[in-house]
A protein has these predicted regions:
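Bacterial N-terminal signal peptides
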Residues: 11-21
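Acidic glycine-/aspartate-rich tracts in secreted/extracellular proteins
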Residues: 54-59, 118-120, 143-144, 215-219, ...
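Protease zymogen maturation seam
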Residues: 97-112, 126-209, 217-223, 227-228, ...
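Extracellular calcium-associated, cysteine-rich motifs in secreted modular proteins
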Residues: 212, 219-220, 227-273
Length: 349
């Protein structure tokens, strides 16, 4: 593994381990943060907690019996029986060829615990925290969109810039935030990201993978087709985990929306407006005479960066996936950049 790739994975793993997230201009969130041990009942999932076992205390087995779950640890078995625990599984599923480094980071010690939803989350947190083998217990906060259902397009200016442009994509003339010469109405020259100068150095490389942790990407979009995908799976064998990451046929990424499947979700990406917009900003094909330009969309011939979809939202504002699992998935997929334009107000301690 390249050292840059390894450092990127470690960075994302540490972010996942500490369970932190930053807020962005497109926030999704919940109620104000609550004191530790007293999660808001409006934002914390009922009947579910996230625990981290101490080193060497992870259950060797979890067996379902008529009387409940059995782990081989008497104190733990008594506690989960008292709570009415119905399911317990790793937060981060077995990672195939990445399992060794997953364990080195201690991510294999995080477990989700499902219990009787009528029981108090606060009481369950305290009961599990008292167990000798438990390092910490956290609520699982719900993530909900607080913005509009759909983006509202701002009126386009009547005039567009007329100066020569680096690529022939028709929408580039209106992407003033890339390079602003002040010629458009109400424009301020230089209020941009200076992208045209950056393109003189590089317009992106298909050796670079960007994980888009957001709504699903429309991988068949005419300005994105060919720039979204996991090549090992795309050209691999159907029904086989060709890249050895623990996920089968994740050709375009993975849909992490909650389900009973394990690993959570499925390989069926559901296109979402915001996720597709974000992917286009990153990797829309440059120089194809279609749509807009991507910041790292290359110089034609799919020479720009590749993106993979780590889907955690749908157009249904009540659907959401597990963000920290999505982050790790992207890192294991070789992403050196994880794009996240979302956030929440409650954070993990």
């Amino acid at each position: 593994m390249h050292s840059f790739e390894k450092k990127s994975w470690l960075h994302i793993a540490l972010c996942a381990l500490s369970l932190l997230a930053a807020c962005a201009s497109d926030p999704i969130g919940e109620e104000a943060p609550q004191p530790v041990g007293e999660p808001s009942q409006e934002t914390a999932a009922t009947g579910r907690l996230r625990v981290k076992f101490k080193q060497g205390e992870v259950p060797e087995r979890i067996i379902e019996t008529r009387s409940g779950l059995q782990t081989g640890s008497e104190p733990l078995d008594r506690a989960i029986a008292a709570l009415g625990v119905t399911r317990m599984q790793r937060v981060f599923p077995p990672a195939g060829r990445f399992e060794a480094r997953t364990r080195r980071a201690g991510l294999d010690r995080w477990y989700d615990v499902w219990f009787d939803s009528l029981r108090s989350v606060t009481r369950a947190t305290l009961d599990l925290s008292r167990l000798e083998g438990i390092e910490c217990v956290e609520p699982v906060y719900a993530i909900r969109s607080i913005g509009p259902e759909r983006a509202v397009a701002a009126p386009l200016p009547a005039a567009t810039r007329t100066a020569s442009l680096p690529f022939d994509d028709p929408g580039l003339a209106k992407q003033w935030h890339y390079s602003n010469d002040g010629s458009m109405p109400d424009a301020v020259a230089g209020a941009d990201i200076n992208l045209f100068r950056a393109w003189e150095v590089t317009a992106g490389s298909n050796d670079v993978v960007v994980a888009v942790v957001d709504g699903g990407i429309d991988y068949a979009h005419e300005d994105l087709v060919g720039n979204v995908g996991n090549w090992a799976e795309l050209y691999g064998e159907e029904g086989v985990d060709d890249d050895g990451n623990g996920y089968v046929d994740d050709i375009y990424g993975w849909n992490f929306i909650y389900s009973s499947a394990y690993p959570m979700g499925s390989n069926r990406i559901t296109p979402v407006e915001h996720g597709t917009h974000v992917a286009g900003t990153i990797a829309a094909e440059n120089g194809n005479g279609i749509g807009v330009c991507g910041v790292a969309g290359g110089r034609g011939g799919h020479s720009g960066v590749r993106v993979i979809s780590c889907q955690m939202f749908t157009e249904n504002r009540n659907d959401n996936g597990d963000e920290i699992v999505a982050l790790k998935y992207g890192a294991d997929a070789g992403a050196v950049i994880s794009q996240n334009s979302w956030g929440y107000t409650n954070v993990y301690e």
